[in-house]
């Protein structure tokens, strides 16, 4: 499971990550990843934080909670790939309710890799 200290809880963190992070779109997920942190928050870094957005379009309460559990578990496995100052928001699309856990995990892994590559400076990308 995703440890509490790695869960995004403040609406301001969600807003900043979605607004300023790099978005990658997949079949069942939309991932917003923000590398680094605003100057005021750098002192209190406790590790990467992950937030979930699972709307009613995904399904009823039982389905939404099942999708949330799958995404939290997949995110917990991928925490070592993130820097301590990273913030990630995962938005579940309606098709995520029927997706396999392995598929969600792979989409999440691909999203992190693509977002990280897009945020690298151009000089480092060409190496």
Swiss-Prot record:
Matches recorded under InterPro entries: Ribosomal_Su5_D2-typ_SF, Ribsml_uS5_D2-typ_fold_subgr, RNase_P
GO biological process, one term: tRNA 5'-leader removal
EC number of this enzyme: 3.1.26.5
Biased composition (Basic and acidic residues): 107-127
Location of region: Disordered: 99-127
Keywords, comma-separated and alphabetical: Endonuclease, Hydrolase, Nuclease, RNA-binding, tRNA processing
GO cellular component, one term: ribonuclease P complex
Gene3D superfamilies in UniProt: 3.30.230.10
Gene Ontology molecular function: any one: ribonuclease P activity
Pfam families membership: Ribonuclease_P
UniProt catalytic activity: Endonucleolytic cleavage of RNA, removing 5'-extranucleotides from tRNA precursor
PANTHER family tied to this protein: RIBONUCLEASE P PROTEIN COMPONENT
Annotated function: RNaseP catalyzes the removal of the 5'-leader sequence from pre-tRNA to produce the mature 5'-terminus. It can also cleave other RNA substrates such as 4.5S RNA. The protein component plays an auxiliary but essential role in vivo by binding to the 5'-leader sequence and broadening the substrate specificity of the ribozyme.
Subunit structure: Consists of a catalytic RNA component (M1 or rnpB) and a protein subunit.
Similarity comment: family membership: Belongs to the RnpA family.
HAMAP family according to UniProt: RNase_P
Protein name: Ribonuclease P protein component
Organism expressing this protein natively: Mycobacteroides abscessus (strain ATCC 19977 / DSM 44196 / CCUG 20993 / CIP 104536 / JCM 13569 / NCTC 13031 / TMC 1543 / L948) (Mycobacterium abscessus)
Lineage: Bacteria, Bacillati, Actinomycetota, Actinomycetes, Mycobacteriales
Gene that this sequence comes from: rnpA
